[in-house]
């Protein structure tokens, strides 16, 4: 049972619920308060009534409007427990604009550095483009947290000493995970600076010493102040950046930069730009102007969004009315403190329940991303980030979760939440993996490319506001249980497809990709030699227009059409000569070209069977005890093979007569020189579960499959009976019983016996991996079909 206790009494909860009836009317459960909280109905009604009642015009025209704006400044300072003689309030468009203002105007001098936390909003990374620092350093969260224990003056430092200035920027609360960096680090940094060599240098020239530098702190408080009190009497950052819609839900388009008196001293005396309202005068006929004396007036370019600013007053009133101060155990608990308790309690409840969600085999459903747990409110806020796993362990893409949630009316957030550094940290992405995701795979911020080779590129985030109810959290838990623990993957995908028309446009596109897709085709022109791969966008080495490859009556065109035999006419395989895997085929310009390893020199053969037959003698061999008839491909290629493989008397044969076998649906299936069936299918999820210490592509190559797919669950292919890829129907012939050939690394020829033992362990002693499939032939598809990488795989 959960230990959750409501922060609100019954009357308070009823009053809050009355303000958000639109959620029930729209059958919506809102769980993205870190994105924006929701506005109360009475809040926007009162704001609209004021606009209808009062004459609110340009503050340069009407002093009344200016008075309203000043009221908001005073109220904001009171909200953060400070006064106008300690902090200036500069109105901006949002927290991003506030960060930009700091970056543009902070005076680093000649030796000052810019330091920022890895787990920061993208806008902090954007500051790097504008700061004029000598060097830039990325700090890990624990490096900043460590500064909280540095002995320092209780309230930081009051001023600056001669010397240059360094700036440290971090988020009070991580918008990815909800982790709160101890604000005591602010005074530690201001008083002691940062230890020399702390952090990773990203750019610039490291100064010989920073001992004389003054250290300033820019606090990105946008996520934090939405649900937590910020006491600027206790903690005194030099700059505080906020967005009001995070706190009140309405209005949007207005934020603020709070600048301490100390922080103001570190701003440049001259600006690179000035707008209307920021100057005493500016001559058009000469480069002469004078900025305003009042600090905030120098930086509020142009006319302020005064209607939005006036609307903030009702936001403050609404919070204080719906979540009033109350006495607890003789102490006074203010509005934001109560909201902090409320959202933390919900997050704690959710985290405990998520940990209890498990599959029948004991596999946890949820992978949580959290630094310190949910026991301490001063360390963790009302945000829970996670991913979902299958019963076999691989991840489910966050795009699928977004689809399932949307169909249940649950609004949550997926991706990296404009915090790639936190994604990198929590998902364990090294620099190579980051390049693979963003540069090679082409993922961009905000898209739904959620899994790359089974690696999540983001997460699912739920976050809470003062109006979130426990019932909302329980509905999320119910969705996860019913959709994942009580429903099989194929049923879930079918339900999503049936209701896809109800999804937003971006999710409709993601829903279309939920079905497994054909990732890659591989043909092995010469039996037991390397593959020629066909991938989306075109085949390797120029084969397969657009990733498409034709089918013949025997399978994929040119697959296992040639084989190498010894002087006795017996087929040579990798069991006897592992170096066969180094013979790499290339199909182009009506030629089959063979190379050995990375050598540019090779030998060519015509693809046309008619051209080959004119000058070739016929001979016989056997494949799996069945006689086959073939054409000898000549002395040139025979000599080339013997030289590279070190075996005398080798010949290359090309199949000239068809083989056939009876499959499970009692059809005569025509075969090439394959051992058992027309096609071998392998699931990358199953390969991934082996967890070999080599690249996933290398492991996939070991299984020498023709058709490579990727599904949500490892080994689910073993349960298939029939499937359709694109427009082509297939019958499953059964699992592929493996031999020690899979112990050979297909890129090097080296053997590693643990491959077989791992499969045996995962399959309870059985040596099964991949499935044999055959095309279901009809009168309409005998000669005209093809497969294309990207085709959807439907299991029937």
Swiss-Prot record:
Enzyme Commission (EC) number: 2.8.1.9
SUPFAM superfamilies: MOSC N-terminal domain-like, PK beta-barrel domain-like, PLP-dependent transferases
Residues with PTM N6-(pyridoxal phosphate)lysine: 246
Biological process according to GO: Mo-molybdopterin cofactor biosynthetic process; molybdopterin cofactor metabolic process
MF-aspect GO terms: lyase activity; molybdenum cofactor sulfurtransferase activity; molybdenum ion binding; pyridoxal phosphate binding
Cofactor(s) this protein requires: pyridoxal 5'-phosphate
Domain of life: Eukaryota
Active site: 418
Phosphoserine, modified sites: 752
Free-text function comment from the UniProt entry: Sulfurates the molybdenum cofactor. Sulfation of molybdenum is essential for xanthine dehydrogenase (XDH) and aldehyde oxidase (ADO) enzymes in which molybdenum cofactor is liganded by 1 oxygen and 1 sulfur atom in active form.
Annotated PANTHER family: MITOCHONDRIAL AMIDOXIME REDUCING COMPONENT 1, MOLYBDOPTERIN COFACTOR SULFURASE MOSC
Protein name per its UniProtKB record: Molybdenum cofactor sulfurase
Biological source species: Drosophila persimilis
């Amino acid at each position: 049972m959960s230990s959750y206790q409501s922060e609100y009494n019954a009357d308070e909860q009823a009053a809050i619920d009355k303000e958000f009836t639109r959620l029930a009317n729209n059958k919506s459960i809102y769980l993205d308060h870190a994105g924006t909280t929701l506005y109360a109905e009475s809040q926007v009604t009162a704001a609209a009534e004021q606009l209808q009642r009062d004459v609110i015009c340009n503050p340069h025209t009407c002093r009344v409007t200016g008075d309203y704006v000043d009221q908001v400044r005073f109220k904001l300072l009171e909200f953060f427990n400070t006064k106008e003689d300690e902090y200036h309030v500069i109105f901006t468009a949002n927290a991003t604009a506030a960060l930009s203002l700091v970056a543009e105007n902070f005076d680093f001098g000649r030796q000052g550095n810019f330091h920022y936390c890895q787990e920061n909003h993208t806008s902090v990374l954007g500051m790097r483009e504008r700061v004029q620092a000598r060097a830039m350093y990325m700090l890990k969260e624990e490096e900043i947290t460590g500064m909280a224990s540095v002995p320092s003056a209780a309230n930081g430092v009051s001023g600056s000493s001669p010397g240059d200035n360094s700036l440290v920027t971090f988020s009070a609360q991580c918008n990815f995970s909800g982790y709160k960096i101890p604000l005591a680090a602010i005074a530690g940094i201001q008083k002691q600076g940062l230890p020399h060599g702390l952090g990773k240098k990203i750019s610039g020239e490291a100064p010989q010493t920073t001992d004389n530098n003054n250290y300033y702190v820019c606090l990105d408080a946008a996520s934090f102040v939405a649900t937590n009190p910020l006491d600027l009497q206790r903690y005194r950052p030099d700059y505080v950046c906020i967005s009001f819609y995070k706190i009140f839900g309405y209005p949007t388009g207005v934020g603020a930069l709070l600048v301490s008196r100390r922080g103001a001293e570190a701003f440049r005396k001259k600006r690179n730009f000035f707008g209307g309202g920021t100057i005493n005068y500016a001559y058009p006929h000469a480069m002469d102007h004078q900025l305003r004396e009042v600090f905030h007036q120098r930086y509020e370019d142009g006319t302020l969004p005064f209607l939005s600013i006036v609307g903030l007053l009702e936001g403050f009133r609404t919070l204080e009315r719906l979540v009033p101060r109350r006495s607890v155990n003789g102490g006074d608990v203010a509005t934001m403190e109560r909201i902090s308790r409320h959202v933390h309690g919900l997050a704690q409840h959710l985290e405990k329940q998520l940990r209890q969600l498990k599959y029948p085999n004991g596999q946890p459903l949820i992978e949580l991303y959290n630094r310190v747990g949910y026991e301490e409110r001063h360390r963790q806020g009302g945000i829970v980030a996670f991913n979902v796993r299958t019963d076999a362990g691989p991840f489910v893409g966050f795009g699928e979760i977004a689809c399932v949630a949307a169909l249940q009316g649950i609004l949550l957030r997926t991706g990296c939440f404009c915090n790639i550094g936190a994604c990198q940290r929590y998902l364990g992405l090294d620099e190579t993996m980051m390049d693979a995701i963003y540069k090679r795979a082409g993922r961009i911020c905000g898209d739904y490319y959620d899994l790359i080779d089974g690696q999540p590129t983001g997460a699912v985030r739920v976050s809470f506001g003062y109006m979130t109810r426990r019932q909302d959290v329980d509905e999320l838990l119910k969705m996860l249980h019913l959709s994942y623990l009580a429903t099989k993957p194929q049923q879930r995908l079918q339900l999503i497809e049936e209701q896809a028309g109800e999804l937003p446009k971006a999710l409709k596109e993601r829903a279309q990709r939920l079905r497994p897709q054909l990732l890659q085709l591989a043909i092995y022109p010469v039996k037991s030699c390397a593959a020629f791969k066909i991938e989306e966008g075109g085949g390797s080495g120029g084969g397969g227009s657009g990733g498409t490859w034709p089918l013949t009556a025997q399978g994929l065109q040119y697959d296992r059409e040639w084989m190498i035999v010894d002087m006795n006419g017996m087929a040579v395989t990798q069991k006897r000569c592992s170096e066969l895997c180094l013979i790499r085929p290339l199909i182009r310009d009506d030629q089959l070209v063979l190379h050995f390893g990375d050598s540019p020199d090779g030998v060519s053969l015509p693809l046309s069977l008619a051209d080959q037959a004119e000058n070739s003698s016929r001979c016989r061999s056997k494949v799996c005890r069945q006689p086959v008839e073939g054409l000898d491909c000549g002395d040139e290629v025979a000599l080339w093979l013997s030289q590279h493989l070190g075996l005398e008397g080798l010949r290359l044969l090309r199949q000239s007569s068809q083989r056939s076998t009876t499959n499970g649906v009692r059809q005569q299936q025509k075969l090439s020189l394959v051992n058992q069936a027309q096609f071998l299918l392998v699931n990358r999820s199953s390969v991934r579960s082996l967890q070999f210490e080599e690249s996933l592509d290398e492991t996939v190559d070991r299984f020498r499959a023709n058709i490579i797919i990727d599904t949500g669950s490892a080994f689910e292919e073993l349960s298939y009976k029939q499937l359709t890829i694109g427009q082509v129907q297939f019958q499953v012939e059964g699992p592929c019983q493996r031999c020690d050939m899979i112990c050979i690394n297909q890129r090097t020829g080296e053997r590693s016996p643990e491959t077989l033992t791992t499969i045996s362990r995962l399959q309870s002693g059985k040596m099964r991996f991949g499935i044999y499939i055959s095309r279901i032939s009809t009168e309409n598809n005998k000669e005209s079909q093809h497969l294309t990488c990207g085709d959807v795989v439907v299991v029937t």
